[in-house]
């Protein structure tokens, strides 16, 4: 989770979780950390596992939250998700979503990377 300050990040993650739950996803786990990466939120969408990266920006300059995920960050999230899948012996379809939040609202990007 990237934010202008940690408190805003926690608020954005909570809002993202509620947003996704209101749209039918089931919460599994939050803030899963490994030495090589972190998964902000783990959800289930039917039988599919969804690894969610939450991005928050207080302003839209420099592309805002939507454009703030780098290839390196996506790689770390993929690596963390792969480890999570192995540890939990998950044999199902998985996807990576991004929740981009700013003061104007939330944007859900399915299959973001």
UniProtKB/Swiss-Prot annotation:
Cysteines engaged in disulfide bonds, as pairs: none
Q: What is this protein called?
A: UPF0102 protein Shal_4069
Species whose genome carries this gene: Shewanella halifaxensis (strain HAW-EB4)
Q: InterPro entries, from UniProt?
A: Restrct_endonuc-II-like (IPR011335), tRNA_endonuc-like_dom_sf (IPR011856), UPF0102_YraN-like (IPR003509)
Q: Which domain of life is it from?
A: Bacteria
Q: Where are the transmembrane segments?
A: none
Q: Pfam families of this UniProt entry?
A: UPF0102 (PF02021)
- Gene3D superfamilies in the record, alphabetically? 3.40.1350.10
GO molecular-function annotation terms?
nucleic acid binding
HAMAP family from the UniProt entry: UPF0102 (MF_00048)
């Amino acid at each position: 989770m990237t934010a202008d300050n940690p408190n805003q990040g926690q608020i954005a993650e909570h809002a993202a979780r509620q947003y996704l739950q209101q749209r039918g996803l089931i919460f599994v786990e939050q803030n899963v950390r490994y030495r090589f990466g972190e998964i902000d939120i783990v959800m289930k969408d039917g039988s599919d596992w969804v690894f969610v990266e939450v991005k928050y920006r207080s302003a839209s300059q420099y592309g805002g939250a939507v454009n703030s995920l780098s290839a390196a960050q996506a790689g770390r999230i993929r690596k963390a998700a792969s480890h999570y899948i192995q540890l939990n012996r998950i044999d199902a379809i998985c996807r990576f979503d991004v929740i981009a939040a700013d003061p104007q609202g939330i944007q859900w990007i399915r299959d973001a990377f």
